[in-house]
Structures are given as C-alpha cells and as structure tokens.
Amino acid sequence: MAAKDVVFGDSARAKMVEGVNILANAVKVTLGPKGRNVVLERSFGGPTVTKDGVSVAKEIELKDKLQNMGAQMVKEVASKTSDNAGDGTTTATVLAQSIVREGMKYVASGMNPMDLKRGIDKAVAAAVEELKKISKPCTTNKEIAQVGAISANSDSSIGDRIAEAMDKVGKEGVITVEDGKSLADELDVVEGMQFDRGYLSPYFINNPDKQVAVLENPFVLLHDKKVSNIRDLLPVLEQVAKAGRPLLIIAEDVEGEALATLVVNNIRGILKTVAVKAPGFGDRRKAMLEDIAILTGGQVIAEETGLTLEKATLAELGQAKRIEVGKENTTIIDGAGEAVNIEARVKQIRTQIEEATSDYDREKLQERVAKLAGGVAVIKVGAATEVEMKEKKARVEDALHATRAAVEEGIVPGGGVALIRARTAIASLTGVNADQNAGIKIVLRAMEEPLRQIVTNGGEEASVVVAAVAAGKGNYGYNAATGEYVDMVEAGVVDPTKVTRTALQNAASVAGLLLTTDAAVAELPKEDAPMPGGMPGGMGGMGMGMGMDM
C-alpha cells in the first residue's frame, strides 16, 4: 500500500479551496447569454470549443492531490445538478464557490464550522420554499421554447424544435437526439408505438420502395413462446383468413415450418401476414407484450393466463388501424385498446418509476410510458463539422432535460433574478446563535453571485446591476443579452424551478462538507527511480592513430 500524506486543519482546507477556485473560475466564464467559450484539448483530432459548464468541469484534473480533491467535489456539484435537472451546472458551481469562499473567511476567524453549516442549511431550506412560491407552471409552447432556448445558450432554433417535438408527442413522449445528415436541424415524429424489432423474413415486404411491410386494419397475435409448428397456428390463421384481414404475429420467435408456411401464404396472396420477434428480454419482454396487448385491445396468449395458440379466437387478438414493419423497427399506429385501460397501465408504470432504484430501469420504464401515452420524436442535429455537431448535440440534450424539468416543477424568472427575489424574502431569517447567523449571511451573499457573474461576463459593472435588480420587484431583472432592465418572463428569460432549486441545494451540500473538513488524506507522489548509469568513458587512444603513419 502506498504511503499517504495526511494534512490537517487550515492547511488542508486552503489547498482544497485552491482546487475549487481553479475549477470554478474555468467553468463560470461560460455563464449567461454573453458567456465566453472554453477550448478543450482532445488526445486526437481538433480541440472542442464549448460553452457548457459540465463539459468544462469534466475535463479538469489537477496535479496536486489536495487541490484535485477540492476540484472533484465541485465537479460532483455540477454533474449531480446536470443528472437531476439537466442544466444549471454553471450556476451550481458559482454558488458552491461563493459559499466556500465566504465560509472560509468565517472559519478562519474562529467560528464553529458545524454551526455555520446549520445556518447554511436553514437558509437554503427557506430559499427553496420561497422559490416554490415564485414558481409558475410551464404549459404553453412558447414557454417551453423559451426554456429550451435559454438552456441551449440562447439558441432559439433549438428551443423551437424541442417545443415542436413536445407538442407532437406530448409532455410524456420520448424525444431522442441523433446526429443529422444535413446542415439544418430536423424533427422526425413517429406516431403510435414503435419497438426495435423488424420482420423475420424480407419476403414479408409489400412496399418495395420503402422496404417495409404495411398492414392496414390488421389483427395482432401476441404469444410469449416460440412458434415452430404450423399446426398450432392453423386454427387462428383460418379465422383471420375468413375475416379477410391481415395479421401481425409478435412472438418470442417464429421459425422452421411455421415461418416457411407464413412466407408461402404471403407470396401467394392467400393470407397477408408478418412475423416479428417480441421486444425486450426476460421480464421486460413480458411487460412489453402486455403493453402492446393493452394498446391494441388484445390479450397475450400465454400458459400463465390459461390461453393456448390452438384454442385462440379473434376475440383474443389485438387490432390496429395501421402497422408498419421495417427491417429494424415495428410501428403500431392507432391501436384499438380502450383509453381507460391504457391510462390505468400508464399509471401503474409511473408508480414503478417512482419505486425504481436504478437509472437504467427508470429510463426503460419512462420509454414504456411514452410509447403508450404519446409517441416518439427524433431531433436530428445538423452541423457543418464534427466538432460543431458534438457541441450542438450536447446543448440540445441539455435543453431537452431543462424543458422536462420546467414541465415538471414550473418556471421562475431567469438571469439570477429568482435567487435575488428569494434572497429578499429570507433576509430577516435568524439562527440560534451568531455563528448560525453568519451561515445564513453566507447563503444570502452567494445568492447574488449568479447575477454578478452573468453581468461580469457581459462586460458590465456587477454591483450597479445587482443593486438595481434588488430594488425592483417580481420579474423585474437585467437581460444581459440586450443590456436592458425588463420583465424577465415577458422577455422569455426563464429558468426551470427545478434547475435553480437543485443548483442551490447541491452547491450548499458540497460547500458545507468542505467547510467542515478538518483533515485530508492523499497519496504521496511516487518518487521516480534514479536513471541507470551511463556507459563507461571511451577507450583511451583508440583514435585514428593506432600507431600507423598516415
């Protein structure tokens, strides 16, 4: 085990604060509409230019172990805020730096760090309650577009695209971001339920131009086992043929003579069918089959429910208006399921989302809700170069997270104004002793900092603007993009409440930990082994002489 360096008290804190400042100073220049760019070196290819705070934070690794600890703690603030709210990483970093900086002054003057932390926590809890009061619901397309634009570093085209996507697939719909093929951004919307399984044989294709199989007004047979014996399928195939409608078979697999017979019937025009594998694996496959059954108004033919293929009737089959089956995807449009049943299923899955412990499970459950409740929209990001594409794609993903957060918890005036208003409301808050009061003061000072930084990045005098905004009321604030004092909500400068709340809570949490740190343990740098000795000196008189006359 390598030897460790143990540092105590002020020495430990001072080094960690240096790391906090290095990281925060690099990140905070990106804040606001006039935020500056940061250039990140890449081990191969050209450098990346970004205005995304979390991208900058992730790149920073310091040589000094103690400085690096401080930097990593603030990096945690940025990434946690990004994970929870999708945006607000730079705001969180600025808040954390301010709380640490002000807090260290009080700790150095001999105040009790634990009481300071209690004061900080008390002020943050009161500020969060105040933010909830200021918050208003985000419902209109215009508001959603504004949130998206602000989060994408004041790019209104990204905000408009996200608002359009949410309008098409609903607030719960799945919106994914992909690399585009052209210079312009594009929006593709898939209505209905889509899952990532395609036809089992290209002979099912009936639209050669698009290379898809299209079934109009089909029945849907859902089975949770493999189908290889055609005799099991014959009774239900005969009933479907009599009804004169096409059939989609979704099963664990369709193989052997069963698949061959379906293909032959399809080619001869006797019965139009398409077979696809069921989506997902294991328990998730059963759940997704159940989802499709509810969407199409059918039942899953499974032994557990006492149903068998041989005895299946048309009543157990689902129905849809139209189904498109491609090489890799199947889309069910306008299933015949009852709206009441679909809503009940969505409610059930939402309960599972709340109880889910892993991010992966939560994401998969949210996808299922979206497929049942809305549809799927794909935003294809267009750019001229690979570097621009990566940077723009990251901004679109940030903006998408932020708009979801806004729909979830509402919006507050942006540009640091919400924190100034919350600050005014809790200015009279007091703790049980002078040290706690100092902790409250630390938070009150920190809540000005995002506005100060936005103004500084815009090249204006921060103190003048902060005083002017603090003297105002409601949504009155400073729009750094235009350099004017306006009603921030009317001007479209808004932030999701969740983003501002999460940034403040995470910043205070990590800053509080730093202030109450009294020892730091880091690995000692390894000493390089001495270089091996050089070759011995040359061999005396072995020059050109060698005793010969030249």
Swiss-Prot record:
Q: Which of UniProt's keywords are assigned here? A: ATP-binding, Chaperone, Cytoplasm, Isomerase, Nucleotide-binding
The catalytic activity, as recorded, is: ATP + H2O + a folded polypeptide = ADP + phosphate + an unfolded polypeptide
* One Pfam assignment: Cpn60_TCP1
What Gene Ontology terms describe where this protein resides (cellular component)? Answer: cytoplasm
Q: Name one GO biological process term.
A: protein refolding
Binding residues for ATP: 30-33, 51, 87-91, 415, 479-481, 495
Q: Which PROSITE patterns match?
A: CHAPERONINS_CPN60
Leader sequence segment: none
Where does it live in the cell? Cytoplasm
Q: Where are the transmembrane segments?
A: none
Report the EC number(s), separated by commas if there are several.
5.6.1.7
- InterPro entries hit by this protein: Chaperonin_Cpn60_CS (IPR018370), Cpn60/GroEL (IPR001844), Cpn60/GroEL/TCP-1 (IPR002423), GroEL-like_apical_dom_sf (IPR027409), GROEL-like_equatorial_sf (IPR027413), TCP-1-like_intermed_sf (IPR027410)
* Entry-linked PANTHER family: 60 KDA HEAT SHOCK PROTEIN, MITOCHONDRIAL (PTHR45633)
How this chain assembles, per its entry, is:
Forms a cylinder of 14 subunits composed of two heptameric rings stacked back-to-back. Interacts with the co-chaperonin GroES.
Which NCBIfam families does the record match to this protein?
GroEL, PRK00013.1, PRK12849.1, PRK12850.1, PRK12851.1
The UniProt entry's sequence similarity note says: Belongs to the chaperonin (HSP60) family.
Q: What is this protein called?
A: Chaperonin GroEL
